[in-house]
Amino acid sequence: MTSAYTGLGVELMVTGENSGTWGDKTNTNLNLLEQISGGYIEQAVNGTGATPLAVIDGNTGAALATRNIKLTGTITGNITVNIPIDVENFYFIENGTSGAYTVEFEYVTGSGSSVTWSATDKGTKIILAKGNDVTNPDIVESVVGGLPGGSNTQVQFNNSGAFGGDADLI
């Protein structure tokens, strides 16, 4: 029996397999887990059409298996960035492209939901790839923030990233 791989490329070795090389493979897996949990990569996208984010089984360096992704390049039409159907993960994705066109993040197949940056939106989104259904998986944007809670007698951290409170608060 041979190794299997997760949707993000982590090798799942079978007992007794890879005699003499399991240490190297385990170290690669640990590096891959580190990349998945907090890595950063700049991913060039195609000017038009689709840009797939692929996994590289048993290797580091794949944009798909990186937590923070900055999309780069000049786009000359609306584009999509897609991921394989078996991926469940969350990402911080920045639209660092130039060109006034939309960027849509979606699964490669299926009819589930997706997340789209408008033609003028060059911001960062927190995106959850649910992988909840093999035919209609959802990709959703996680909205963080909102109006601050509390009163003017409490210290508040608001959605602009500033602290607020009453002038007489001591």
Task: State each model region's role.
Residues 30-39, 99-108, 113, 126-146, ...:
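Short, surface-exposed terminal/edge motifs of secreted or surface/virion proteins that either
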Residues 154-158:
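Small-residue hinge/turn detector
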Residues 18-24, 121-123, 134-136:
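Extracellular interaction modules
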Residues 1-9, 16-103:
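Exposed extracellular interaction/assembly regions and N-terminal maturation sites
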Residues 45-47, 120, 144:
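Sequence/structural signature of small/polar-enriched beta-strand/turn repeats
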Residues 86-88, 120-124:
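Tight coil/turn sites that cap or link beta-strands
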Residues 118, 151-152:
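Extracellular/luminal recognition modules and glycoprotein regions
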